[in-house]
Amino acid sequence: MACKKHTQEEGMAIIITSSAFFHNENIPSVYTCDGRDISPPLAWQNIPPAAKSLALIVDDPDAPDPAAPKMTWVHWVLYNIPVESPGLEEGISPAALPDGTMEGINDWRRTGYGGPCPPIGRHRYLFKLYALGIVLPDLQEPIKAELEKSMQGHILEKAELIGTYQRSG
């Protein structure tokens, strides 16, 4: 099944937004290691009718240095988010996640959100929302690559919200 990739500018069907920052704009420090390190509020709309679940991956493709990126750092992995869910509230705890939502392991080797904390320069943070044609089995806290492998062939649409952050000093 082919996946349609959308960006904020295209006036797409599936949309992910945050009331805390605009697409390609700065992420407020409260959502970073320099602040409270809590997850930003996220909202989505126009989920395809055939979707059975949603997945969210937040990562930084500019690690460790945007001038010479060597890896993508994973900040948050969620899957089996119910399609009826309109989004995630600011600073959401694991217990408050929508019923059925499962967490994966980020690159700090733990579940949950880990905010931006770039060592060098201004980094991009990609909030990628996937509409899936299935509800995935319990993957036992997968890393991003394991989740992506399980999603193959089941992605109906994808939306992306990009935020940026650079530490001061």
Range-by-range predicted roles:
Residues A2-G169:
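N-terminus-centered regions that define maturation/targeting leaders and the start
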